[in-house]
Amino acid sequence: DIISKQLLGVINMVVVNCFWNRNENYYLDSDWHGSKLKDGGPLFTQFSHFIDILYWLFGDIDNASSQFFSFNKKKYVEFEDSGIVKLNFSNKAIGVLNYSTAVWNKNFESSITILGEHGSVKIGGQYMDKILDCDIKEYNSPNIDDDIACNDYGGYTGSASNHDKMIENVVQVLLDKKNVHTNFIDGLHVVKIIESIYSSRN
């Protein structure tokens, strides 16, 4: 709502931090977890949702630059566990994505900070479910009190438990009762952004 009504004015910068835990139990749970060919890496498997958010809110990118790191150095992981990505959006905004699956013990943070000419807003928490700060010209910060559960897989916890809402939308669309929330074109754009980010990865 804040973005669609342009309450922030021109968007100058957006920063997304995703610091998660994916331990040995996760990678040994399946033969595709950790495989460069089958898994693709954390931007496809864990953090595509956040790139989707960036695309949904701010549109396409002109270019991306990135650095990748392997802090855990696990022999069963064929790609990075962490990275820093700079995005140049077509609307001239600058984006930064910091991500890691090498966080100790549990998911630590999923946040987005948006800096605009008329204000700033930060949404965060473990599952990007809390307004941490909102300072916008002539605007009162909304209250969000919803508690969001996570997907618990036993040996590790996943993202926020929202998959049921997407599945329900698919069912309702097939029954001709609702409009689709998203389409494959949007999904392809997100894949292209990730491929652009990964183009510098060996």
Q: What do these predicted ranges mean?
A:
Residues D1-Y76:
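Predominantly a Rossmann-like dinucleotide-binding segment in NAD(P)-dependent oxidoreductases
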Residues S90, K165-N202:
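C-terminal helix-rich "cap/oligomerization" subdomain common to oxidoreductases
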Residues T45, E109, T182:
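Residue-level signal for the nucleotide or nucleotide-sugar donor/cofactor binding architecture
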Residues K74-F79, N91-K165:
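NAD(P)-dinucleotide binding in Rossmann-like oxidoreductases
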Residues G40-G41, Y153-G158, D176-V180:
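Active-site rim elements
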Residues V85-L87:
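Short beta-strand scaffold segments in enzyme catalytic cores
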Residues H49-I53, N162, M166-V170:
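Hydrophobic alpha-helical segments typical of transmembrane helices
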